Amino acid sequence: MIIYKDILTGDEIISDAFNLKEVDNILWEVDCRNITIGDENIQLEGANPSAEGEDDDAGGAGNAEQVLDIKHNFRLNDYPKLEKDEYKKAIKGYMKKVLAKLEEKKAPEETIKEFKENAQTALKRILANYKDYDVLVGESFGADAMHILINYREDGVTPYATFWKHGLEEYKV
């Protein structure tokens, strides 16, 4: 299995267990699922809760909540959404830091070139739809953390996450 960590904070962000789709040679998108966590009421197969007197909350959600699978699996956190102009400044600073980190780690020249050439195209795509995104960050809430952008596909039902490909580092486990 391959875990992808934020290149600046070291936070685990995503793994190859998800189907990563490359966009514009710089972004990765992955479809997510809403899962229910909390208030696990474990019942044995074949058990009859009403006969056991355990159907008091039948149909109730209790303390269960719906979250995105990647948020739960990688301990991602909701992050206050910046105004569009603030985000623009923040993302430009983030891209400079990623570029510096790629150079520091002696990434291949073609990787650095790919990042430089495609960053503006990706940023324009993101800014055009920025109002539709929710934002997550890694577990550390680091100041330099990648903003993971969450939106919904055209069907309005399927959530997906967007990551900066060059802002992730691969670790095999």
UniProtKB/Swiss-Prot annotation:
**Could you name the domain of life of the organism this protein comes from?**
Eukaryota
The signal peptide, as residue positions, is none
Task: Look up and give the organism this protein is from.
Answer: Aspergillus oryzae (strain ATCC 42149 / RIB 40) (Yellow koji mold)
Q: An example Gene Ontology cellular component term from the record?
A: microtubule
Keywords in alphabetical order: Cytoplasm, Cytoskeleton, Microtubule, Protein biosynthesis
Give the protein family.
Answer: Belongs to the TCTP family.
Q: What is this protein called?
A: Translationally-controlled tumor protein homolog
- Main location (coarse class): cytoplasm
Q: What does this protein do?
A: Involved in protein synthesis. Involved in microtubule stabilization.
Q: Where are the transmembrane segments?
A: none
Compartments (UniProt record):
Cytoplasm, Cytoskeleton
Q: Which GO terms describe its biological process?
A: translation
Enumerate the InterPro entries for this protein.
Mss4-like_sf, Mss4/transl-control_tumour, TCTP, Translation_control_tumour_CS, Translational_control_tumour_p
* Annotated ranges, domain TCTP: 1-173
Molecular function terms, GO-annotated? calcium ion binding
- Lineage, opening ranks: Eukaryota, Fungi, Dikarya, Ascomycota, Pezizomycotina
